[in-house]
Amino acid sequence: MSKLKDPMDDSLKNKLNKEKAIELARVQIEKDFGKGSLIKMGESPVGKYLESIPSGSILLDEAIGIGGYPRGRVVEIFGPESSGKTTLTLQAIAEIQKTGGIAAFIDAEHALDPVYARALGVNINELWLSQPDTGEQALDIAEYLIRSGGVDLIVVDSVAALTPQAEIDGEMGDTQIGLQARLMSKALRKITAILSKSNTCIMFINQIRMKIGLVFGSPETTTGGNALKFYSSLRLEVRKVEQVIGSSSDNVIGNKIRVKVVKNKVAPPFRKAELIVYFGKGISREASILDAAIKYNLVQKSGSWYAMGDDNLGQGRENVIEYLFKEKALANELENKLRKIIFESPSQDSLTVDISKSEENKE
């Protein structure tokens, strides 16, 4: 009686033949295009956890999902005027500088306030600044900085101010359609190819415009065409929610802003974070810590009183925030505990996932 052939033997032989064939292809690819042109995903940085740049608020870090802004990716921050967009980017610059990182600010609007930047914790003596004349110049500078591999964070303020050379050379009444959109599309094609290798995060601040004659759907859109929407791994929408009132009813000391993650390729999208931004001081780290501590039951609230276990922290939210601001050690202890709770046990949600076109899918 003849012995039956084990189908597993054929399967194993087939797999070995395929592996041998792809190894020959890999050798030829590396010969033509250089070492590392084709590798298994687990051997590359793409297959590992993404590094991130802290935002300055643990609530926003949680909403983004990976503990901050992703390195090696494009980030877009957009919203109405005076909603806190530039504040978010300056806070990120301050955070990366604290770890010894290098940041650059491409000020296409020519409106960066060094006094305000310093108040937010930015070391302006170490911040690289460019105030380009044209959009092409701004994006070329960004490309050079990324290729250098020496810059951790680049901020472009703003997309709306990236004026194409042809528009500057033309007359005021000239009609030039799609110049800025084509400029952004070409620049982003070049930039994204080199971003991941340099591990640089580039953040674009963008403004909102209104669509004319729209009957259904939101009339709001962002400037610069659709390229930035597609190439961005993270898109944050910033809105002012309400004013923060001080000791008297007519004393406005800041704003509460809501940051919504409308697109996220590195974690689940559509999360929100509400932050307190004080005038002249920036994002309140202590307010974010307090809100997160209440959320995760590290701090208990009873009426207007706040306690941490058996220890009373104070009465009234603003008083407790002020107390945490003075007691740096306690604030740091709370933040470290929160980061362990939120980020230290990686789940499938915190892995690098490609949720492409998340914003478009929602629509």
Curated annotation (Swiss-Prot):
ATP binds at residues 79-86. Pfam families: RecA, RecA_C. CDD domains: RecA (cd00983). GO terms for biological process: DNA recombination; DNA repair; SOS response. GO terms for molecular function: ATP binding; ATP hydrolysis activity; ATP-dependent DNA damage sensor activity; damaged DNA binding; single-stranded DNA binding. The keyword NAD does not apply. Disulfide bonds: none annotated. The keyword DNA-binding applies. Keywords: ATP-binding, Cytoplasm, DNA damage, DNA recombination, DNA repair, DNA-binding, Nucleotide-binding, SOS response. GO terms for cellular component: cytoplasm. It is found in: Cytoplasm. Its main location: cytoplasm. It comes from the Bacteria. PANTHER family: MITOCHONDRIAL DNA REPAIR PROTEIN RECA HOMOLOG-RELATED, RECA. Belongs to the RecA family. Can catalyze the hydrolysis of ATP in the presence of single-stranded DNA, the ATP-dependent uptake of single-stranded DNA by duplex DNA, and the ATP-dependent hybridization of homologous single-stranded DNAs. It interacts with LexA causing its activation and leading to its autocatalytic cleavage. HAMAP family: RecA. This is Protein RecA. It comes from Borrelia duttonii (strain Ly). The lineage of its organism: Bacteria, Pseudomonadati, Spirochaetota, Spirochaetia, Spirochaetales.
